[in-house]
Amino acid sequence: MSVIDHVRDMAAAGLHSNVRLLSSLLLTMSNNNPELFSPSQKYQLLVYHADSLFHDKEYRNAVSKYAMALQQKKALSKTSKVRPSTGNSASTPQSQCLPSEIEVKYKMAECYTMLKLDKDAIAVLDGIPSRQRTPKINMMLANLYKKAGQERPSVTSYKEVLRQCPLALDAILGLLSLSVKGAEVASMTMNVIQTVPNLDWLSVWIKAYAFVHTGDNSRAINTICSLEKKSLLRDNVDLLGSLADLYFRAGDSKNSVLKFEQAQMLDPYLIRGMDVYGYLLAREGRLEDVENLGCRLFNISDQHAEPWVVSGCHSFYSKRYSRALYLGAKAIQLNSNSVQALLLKGAALRNMGRVQEAIIHFREAIRLAPCRLDCYEGLIECYLASNSIREAMVMANNVYKTLGANAQTLTLLATVCLEDPVTQEKAKTLLDKALAQRPDYVKAVVKKAELLSREQKYEDGIALLRNALANQSDCVLHRILGDFLVAVNEYQEAMDQYSIALSLDPNDQKSLEGMQKMEKEESPTDATQEEDVDDMEGSGEEGDLEGSDSEAAQWADQEQWFGMQ
């Protein structure tokens, strides 16, 4: 048994640190005496040494050693006869089982992706002839092409993966995300569905995610619910996570939180989707829950973007925007495709007044998730913050046409129309349409209330808000109702509404300001009663508090968010 065989056995046993030390010494010996090992043996040493470096995450060093190994392999292929080794008395047949050159190139590409050098990774994998590409090589190529915006070769590579592995579900999702029709994708899996038992759900699964990637949230929800109700797929964490995300996109925060909680109970180590869950909790003012969630996720893994995003949400809603910016940047560093991280960083930049930088991040989020409305909302808010109403209007109209006329797109367009006095009536019409579709949609209710406040139609606003609060409890709605009640001199109930708002979100500054303002004032009834008491006591002193007409508390702009639902 040769020394190379020992190195190979240690590598197979996972003794990477041992392989690294021994192979380093043997390579130095080979450099000092080129006759010590044959070309094939040196090739093996270089590959095993590079593998150990890869395991230690020294990717640049590993790439250089893989490149040297490939050069050695070229020299080996030109050598018709293996030179005898002076360092080993015999060469077993096992020692001639050389590491695959294709596998070396794949590992090399992996190093490049870890170093964020995607073009170099593509170049290495492109150098492998199509017929020699394994499914994992095609999968990596497909993902790299997709990331680079090269849709056609990406589709081709995904299809090649499915040709070899028809149950590669992530490849199916990749094709659907590139606008390949669900029927075409389903046809590529038909044979396996018909021949393998208990796979009748797969065609429905493909149909559901086809709806997801076309932005048809309601049909996607219904289809996944039908899957989730089947006994064999009940309580599947991935399906629950998808449902939670779809409810989030559809603006149904309540059901989204419920599904995230259900998935989390089934899998306490779940990370995927927890960034959205943390954002929803932060938006509801549940900052203590957000902090606990962040700590739990960091204990699971700090090498994923989600824990950093959750912690960033806590900072953002605590108005610590610089820290939120740092945490968002850290999340992007770990996963450049994290949409929620891009939205967090963009929102922090916007609130810090760095609008142009924020715009770049929101545009990247749109590129990665063209069906997510919150990405467009962040960009439109930046346009409005910089008084670029025309750009905001163009974007809102494009979203309306692309994603269809639903309550969310109607409200988004109305939000922009409210910024221009000329389009106030159009805003009113759009909001009425949105509320006709979803009477409890919070963003639409808030904007309609804003419009009624401008027109001083407080009674209409109170009726609107009471109706919206009939089946839900929302901090912003309770606070605005309190503002409207102050405007019609209903002080006691206004105080009650502010109290409810603060119970839902103790950090809601506007509710606190409204309550403090009321405490400093006194209603006319109380003032009269105080004067009567003074007269009865014959004090002759007049109350020093004058009754005043309280105007509606200025609730102004609705709260900042980096994902409007």
Swiss-Prot record:
GO terms for biological process: anaphase-promoting complex-dependent catabolic process; brain development; cell division; protein branched polyubiquitination; protein K11-linked ubiquitination; protein K48-linked ubiquitination; protein ubiquitination. The keyword RNA-binding does not apply. InterPro entries: TPR-like_helical_dom_sf, TPR_rpt. Residues 513-523 have a biased composition (Basic and acidic residues). Pfam families: TPR_16, TPR_8. It is found in: Cytoplasm, Cytoskeleton; Nucleus; Cytoplasm, Cytoskeleton, Spindle. The modification N6-acetyllysine is found at K229. The keyword Repeat applies. V-shaped homodimer. The mammalian APC/C is composed at least of 14 distinct subunits ANAPC1, ANAPC2, CDC27/APC3, ANAPC4, ANAPC5, CDC16/APC6, ANAPC7, CDC23/APC8, ANAPC10, ANAPC11, CDC26/APC12, ANAPC13, ANAPC15 and ANAPC16 that assemble into a complex of at least 19 chains with a combined molecular mass of around 1.2 MDa; APC/C interacts with FZR1 and FBXO5. PANTHER family: ANAPHASE-PROMOTING COMPLEX SUBUNIT 7 (PTHR12558:SF36), CELL DIVISION CYCLE 16,23,27 (PTHR12558). Belongs to the APC7 family. This is Anaphase-promoting complex subunit 7. It comes from Mus musculus (Mouse).
